[in-house]
């Protein structure tokens, strides 16, 4: 039996209940015969259309079968019930009474479509993936495909999701604390507005106001630099930013600097819930951290009993200390919240959580092996977001970073202000020096003068800050209130972030864990411990790449109980199949005969 015969047979056999045709965009559509539309048979052009590379006759036949709708009674099918269904029927040009096909009938890969139709516009402006989006097999691959082509609709969080988010935040704040700057920032903003109004100033250079792009600077200073400092000083950190670049064509992650900018390299971001730096043989061993704390207390001046670290010395010194404690290793943990006091029973769900921790561990390996590589990765990350890595941060952003993390940034900011190198060659050779008017903002409106010496006015402003904050601003802020020679930028923060990753490059352990907690009480239900396996992760990465490349026909779940939670269940054939003991019994005799013929063809091939 030839492929052409099957095509003709399919066109003739299906004419009794549905028709398949291609529109001018190459979009495979399924129509109902009661609608008066032009009908075309499936022609030879289908062989080369909407598929990746040469396909065998059998593969094409399989695609034809999968695109068919296998429902018994078309007239009783429910109408489209939600936004996701309406979107996917529109995007796939489907007749609303037909069920969803099992494969993508468009010319776009899932990654391409996600990057042009997405509820979250940031994915259009900066096409990318997340670690969770690589975990396509955790529940149902077919649902993942439908969600992408429905436009990645953002749905309101459920009660369980909101409670889980609160628990994550509670654990994070219990470890890292929160410095509330709302009152002091309101004071600075109102004072700035008064100055701008009195002197008719325009904030062309972002000196006075907060730029939206500065949020990434706050993120890097907090969730990379501060968190990794906590890891080396306190043995633990939560909510740490990680990322890598997945080459979708090679189906592997980028490991060299030259490949980062390759168009096929897709940014993949994630936030690991917890990293611990510990002796796996003795969790009560804190000798390393006692040594680090002793070093900090002896070597650095303190303000408010907090050492002011000189990062130019810190990195090499701490690496030398770590070398004396070879037993300490990193452990990566993902936290899952559960409304009931039991862990998931489905193996695919457990495996998905395991691979999530594997990705985090691997990303940290990539970023920690070489500071220059991590530096380039971070710069590319910012550039893909449309950010200028050499644009000076707003004065308010710089103040926020200084206030929250003065123990890490004060000495560095002195170096930038004086135009001195920070001790990281890639940054020092690429930095752009320009005047940065940091001091102009910190003057009371009534004392402000654009072209006069303002030292005395600065003191008055600092006295006013004392009404909101007990920090010794005369020691930490006053020396910086001048025109800096080198402005703080994302490039600077990328440099320091990269150096913090590199501290741990030789201490990547092979243990990852998934911790299950009750959503409402926070109590630990169970902890799954895994041994990192790079080979397993490579296989998982290839599978995920095939999905996003459009090379993979997604596998539907074989656990029909999962279908009751799916937003596509009313138009998906899988739950219908699950309700009958023999799926062929519900298919019309013409289609059943066709399927039997195909079985014979498979035997003949």
UniProtKB/Swiss-Prot annotation:
Q: Entry cofactor note text?
A: Binds 1 [4Fe-4S] cluster.
- Tell me any Pfam family this protein matches: Exo5
Gene Ontology CC: one annotated term: mitochondrion
Q: What is its EC number?
A: 3.1.-.-
Q: What are the GO MF terms of this UniProt record? A: 4 iron, 4 sulfur cluster binding; DNA binding; metal ion binding; single-stranded DNA 5'-3' DNA exonuclease activity
Compartments, record wording: Mitochondrion
Q: Name the needed cofactors.
A: Mg(2+); [4Fe-4S] cluster
What the entry lists under InterPro entries is as follows:
EXOV
Transit peptide extent on chain: 1-17
State the PANTHER family in the record: EXONUCLEASE V (PTHR14464:SF4)
Task performed by this protein: Single strand DNA specific 5' exonuclease involved in mitochondrial DNA replication and recombination. Releases dinucleotides as main products of catalysis. Has the capacity to slide across 5'double-stranded DNA or 5'RNA sequences and resumes cutting two nucleotides downstream of the double-stranded-to-single-stranded junction or RNA-to-DNA junction, respectively.
Quaternary structure and partners: Monomer.
Which protein is depicted? Answer: Exonuclease V, mitochondrial
Q: Per the UniProt entry, what species is this protein from, by scientific name?
A: Candida tropicalis (strain ATCC MYA-3404 / T1)
Mind giving the lineage of the organism this protein is from? Answer: Eukaryota, Fungi, Dikarya, Ascomycota, Saccharomycotina
Primary gene name? EXO5
């Amino acid at each position: 039996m030839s492929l052409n015969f099957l095509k003709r047979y399919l066109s003739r056999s299906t004419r009794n209940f549905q028709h398949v045709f291609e529109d001018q965009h190459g979009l495979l559509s399924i129509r109902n015969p009661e609608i008066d539309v032009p009908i075309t048979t499936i022609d030879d052009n289908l062989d080369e259309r909407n598929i990746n590379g040469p396909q065998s006759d059998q593969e094409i036949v399989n695609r034809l079968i999968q695109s068919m709708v296998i429902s018994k009674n078309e007239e009783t099918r429910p109408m489209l019930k939600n936004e996701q269904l309406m979107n996917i029927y529109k995007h796939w040009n489907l007749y609303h009474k037909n069920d969803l096909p099992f494969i993508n009938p468009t010319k776009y890969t899932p990654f391409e479509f996600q990057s042009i139709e997405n509820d979250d516009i940031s994915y259009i402006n900066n096409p990318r993936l997340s670690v969770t989006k690589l975990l396509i097999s955790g529940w149902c691959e077919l649902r993942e495909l439908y969600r992408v082509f429905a436009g990645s609709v953002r749905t309101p969080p459920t009660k369980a999701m909101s409670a889980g988010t609160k628990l994550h935040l509670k654990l994070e704040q219990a470890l890292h604390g929160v410095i509330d700057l709302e009152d002091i920032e309101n004071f600075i903003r109102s004072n700035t507005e008064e100055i701008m109004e009195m002197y008719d100033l325009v904030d062309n250079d972002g000196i006075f106001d907060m730029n939206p792009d500065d949020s990434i600077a706050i993120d890097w200073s907090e969730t990379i630099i501060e968190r990794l400092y906590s890891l080396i000083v306190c043995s633990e950190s939560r909510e740490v930013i990680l990322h890598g670049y997945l080459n979708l064509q090679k189906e592997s992650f980028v490991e060299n600097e030259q490949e980062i900018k390759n168009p096929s390299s897709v940014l993949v971001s994630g936030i690991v819930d917890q990293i611990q730096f510990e002796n796996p043989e003795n969790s009560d061993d804190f000798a390393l951290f006692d040594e680090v704390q002793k070093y900090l207390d002896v070597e650095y001046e303190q303000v408010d009993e907090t050492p002011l670290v000189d990062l130019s010395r810190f990195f090499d010194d701490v690496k030398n200390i770590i070398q004396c404690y070879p037993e300490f290793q990193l452990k990566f943990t993902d936290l899952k919240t559960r409304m009931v006091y039991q862990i998931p029973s489905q193996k695919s769900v457990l495996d998905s959580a395991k691979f999530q921790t594997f990705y985090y561990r691997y990303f940290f390996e990539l970023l920690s092996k070489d500071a220059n590589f991590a530096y380039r990765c971070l710069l590319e990350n910012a550039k893909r977001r449309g950010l200028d890595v050499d644009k000076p941060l707003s004065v308010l952003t710089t103040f926020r970073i200084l206030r929250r993390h003065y123990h890490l940034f004060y000495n560095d900011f002195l170096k930038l202000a004086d135009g001195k190198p920070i001790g990281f060659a890639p940054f020092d050779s690429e930095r752009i020096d320009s005047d940065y008017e940091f001091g102009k903002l910190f003057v009371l409106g009534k004392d402000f003068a654009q072209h006069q010496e303002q030292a005395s006015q600065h003191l008055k402003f600092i006295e006013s800050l004392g009404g909101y904050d007990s920090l010794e601003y005369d020691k930490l802020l006053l020396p910086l209130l001048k025109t800096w020679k080198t402005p703080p930028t994302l490039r600077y923060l990328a440099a320091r972030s990269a150096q913090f990753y590199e501290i741990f490059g030789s201490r990547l352990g092979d243990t990852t864990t998934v911790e299950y907690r009750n959503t409402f009480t926070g109590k630990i239900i169970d902890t799954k411990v895994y041994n990192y396996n790079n080979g397993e992760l490579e296989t998982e990465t290839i599978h995920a790449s095939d999905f996003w490349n459009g090379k993979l026909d997604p596998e539907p779940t074989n656990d029909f109980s999962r279908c009751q939670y799916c937003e596509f269940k009313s138009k998906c054939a899988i739950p219908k199949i699950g309700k009958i003991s023999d799926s062929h019994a519900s298919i019309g005799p013409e289609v059943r005969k066709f399927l039997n013929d195909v079985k014979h063809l498979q035997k003949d091939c």
